Amino acid sequence: NLLQFEKMIKKMTGKEPVVSYAFYGCYCGSGGQGKPKDATDRCCFVHDCCYGKVTGCDPKMDVYSFSEENGDIVCGGDDPCKKEICECDRAAAICFRDNLNTYNDKKYWAFGAKNCPQEESEAC
């Protein structure tokens, strides 16, 4: 669920997830449209696409099982749907970490939908 995703982001990036990512670019946070503005925004785009492929459970609400081992996140549990949600969140948290060098909150925080034209939207 979203609280678990926040824990993963904090673990991987050291950043406060809501402050740093909930209103970033065109895709981080609720919804999304337009063209991703940078690598971090693309992480969110891919995460949205990943959630879109999950069927049979609720990515934002269902609780899954994960652990931290040697600085990595390991998804566990027996429910394949919840494990899929976990893997979506894990991949996004790692993507955020791997793109910290280009994260630009001065440019893309609270970017707003008006700067993300619907006609520029990409398919998953």
Curated annotation (Swiss-Prot):
Catalytic activity field: a 1,2-diacyl-sn-glycero-3-phosphocholine + H2O = a 1-acyl-sn-glycero-3-phosphocholine + a fatty acid + H(+)
One Gene Ontology term of the molecular function aspect: calcium ion binding
Coiled-coil ranges (or none): none
Entry-linked Pfam families: Phospholip_A2_1
Cell compartment(s), UniProt: Secreted
Family statement drawn from the similarity comment of this UniProt entry: Belongs to the phospholipase A2 family. Group II subfamily. D49 sub-subfamily.
Keyword flag rRNA-binding: no
UniProt entry keywords in alphabetical sequence: Calcium, Disulfide bond, Hydrolase, Lipid degradation, Lipid metabolism, Metal-binding, Secreted
Tissue occurrence: Expressed by the venom gland.
Single GO biological process annotation from the record: arachidonate secretion
Cofactor(s) required for function per UniProt: Ca(2+)
Cofactor details (free text): Binds 1 Ca(2+) ion.
InterPro entries: PLipase_A2, PLipase_A2_Asp_AS, PLipase_A2_dom, PLipase_A2_dom_sf, PLipase_A2_His_AS
EC number(s) on file: 3.1.1.4
Key word Phosphoprotein present: no
Gene Ontology CC terms, in alphabetical order: extracellular region
Binding site for Ca(2+): 27, 29, 31, 48
Function: PLA2 catalyzes the calcium-dependent hydrolysis of the 2-acyl groups in 3-sn-phosphoglycerides.
PROSITE patterns documented for this protein: PA2_ASP, PA2_HIS
Catalytic residue list: 47, 89
Protein name: Acidic phospholipase A2 BA2
Enzyme class, broadest EC rank: hydrolase
Disulfide bond residue pairs: 26-116, 28-44, 43-95, 49-124, 50-88, 57-81, 75-86
